[in-house]
Amino acid sequence: MGLSDQEWQHVLTIWGKVESDLAGHGHQVLMRLFQDHPETLDRFEKFKGLKTPDQMKGSEDLKKHGVTVLTQLGKILKQKGNHESELKPLAQTHATKHKIPVKYLEFISEAIIKVIAEKHASSFGADSQAAMKKALELFRNDMASKYKEFGFQG
């Protein structure tokens, strides 16, 4: 299920655009996640009080966490599938401490695709979208495998 060199090129090219504004992209991704899937808010103690889009827009903590999420994902994507050393500690905290279900990783992947498509429509065509979806699926599958190693069925 690996990606071809060309697919990784698509992923990393669009990711460069994401990295040009990690705070903006990350904030929008988390807002989209929480608006589309409000049940995910239950996993974030410090964000539970954010009920409206305006509250989410005004949250510096949400913006900071968005940067953290996309920074970590960027490190993983740049490894082009050889991400064991980056993925293992992330999977461990998400499995044992935060208890984030794999389904929620699917939800955030959808949010990432939607936000990139909205912000970079002209650069995120069908080939780039397909490659990014495939890269995020690889990430989720590898997270799910690691979850099992840590005894979390997610």
Curated annotation (Swiss-Prot):
Binding positions (heme b): H94
Protein's UniProt keywords contain Plastid: no
Binding, nitrite: H65
Catalytic activity annotation: Fe(III)-heme b-[protein] + nitric oxide + H2O = Fe(II)-heme b-[protein] + nitrite + 2 H(+); H2O2 + AH2 = A + 2 H2O
Gene Ontology terms: cellular component: extracellular exosome; sarcoplasm
InterPro entries documented for this protein: Globin, Globin-like_sf, Myoglobin
Stated family: Belongs to the globin family.
Protein name per the record: Myoglobin
Organism: Uria lomvia
